[in-house]
From Swiss-Prot:
Coiled-coil boundaries: none
Family indicated by similarity: Belongs to the eukaryotic ribosomal protein eL13 family.
GO cellular component terms listed in the entry, alphabetical order: cytoplasm; cytosol; cytosolic large ribosomal subunit; cytosolic ribosome; synapse
Record PTM N6-acetyllysine, positions in chain: K16, K177
Name of the featured protein: Large ribosomal subunit protein eL13
Cross-link Glycyl lysine isopeptide (Lys-Gly) (interchain with G-Cter in SUMO2): residue positions: K123, K145, K174, K177
Domain of life: Eukaryota
Pfam families tied to this protein: Ribosomal_L13e
MF terms (GO), sorted A to Z: RNA binding; structural constituent of ribosome
Length: 211
């Protein structure tokens, strides 16, 4: 590997006939063609289902650095499916991914994904298992004629940014200490239980003193 940026200049100590062990990438163009053919074969195999696979939930990226962005998750939580009125076993059969390990930590995420599931159900064209005997919930014959295979992602997720208009900075904003406030908030969250315990012990001691 060539030296990059302001690091130490390396002195590679090669042994073991390294020239016979150089990793080459001559298969890259053929690999690209193979991947494309595999995608096309899968799309033909699963038709008329969406080529990109089942619908995925909207999740927020972890850590402070990335939590302003949303992306596709692994699967919908059991709570989201329950609120949307879809059985977990049925969900997988109609192109909805399920992840039983996932937990909803906010009402907003739950509501957003429930809304996503309801919108998906309203747009879904469901083929009957037996064309001669359609069941309740299956799409009508007119809808089945309109069905085409979706090639892109199912209901793509977009990051929406709200642009704010330029305005004058207030005195309160100038005096606000962002880093100190974050440190204080973290400290308060960390020490919440200890402080509650101390307050309880102090109250008990006061009661004993009064006796």
């Amino acid at each position: 590997m060539a030296p990059s940026r302001n690091g130490m200049i390396l002195k590679p100590h090669f042994h073991k006939d390294w020239q016979q062990r150089v990793d080459t990438w001559f298969n890259q163009p053929a690999r690209k063609i193979r991947r494309r053919k595999a995608r096309q074969a899968k799309a033909r195999r699963i038709a008329p289902r969406p080529a990109s696979g089942p619908i995925r939930p909207i999740v927020r990226c972890p850590t402070v650095r990335y939590h302003t962005k949303v992306r596709a998750g692994r699967g919908f939580s059991l709570e989201e499916l329950r609120v949307a009125g879809i059985h977990k076993k049925m969900a997988r059969t109609i192109g909805i991914s399920v992840d039983p390990r996932r937990r909803n930590k906010s009402t907003e995420s739950l509501q957003a994904n429930v809304q996503r599931l309801k919108e998906y159900r309203s747009k879904l064209i469901l083929f009957p298992r037996k064309p001669s005997a359609p069941k309740k919930g299956d799409s009508s014959a007119e809808e089945l004629k309109l069905a085409t295979q979706l090639t892109g992602p199912v209901m793509p997720i977009r990051n929406v940014y709200k642009k704010e208009k330029a305005r004058a900075i207030t005195e309160e904003e100038k005096n606000f200490k962002a880093f100190a406030s974050l440190r204080m908030a973290r400290a308060n969250a960390r020490l919440f239980g200890i402080r509650a315990k101390r307050a309880k012990e102090a109250a008990e001691q006061d009661v004993e003193k009064k006796k």
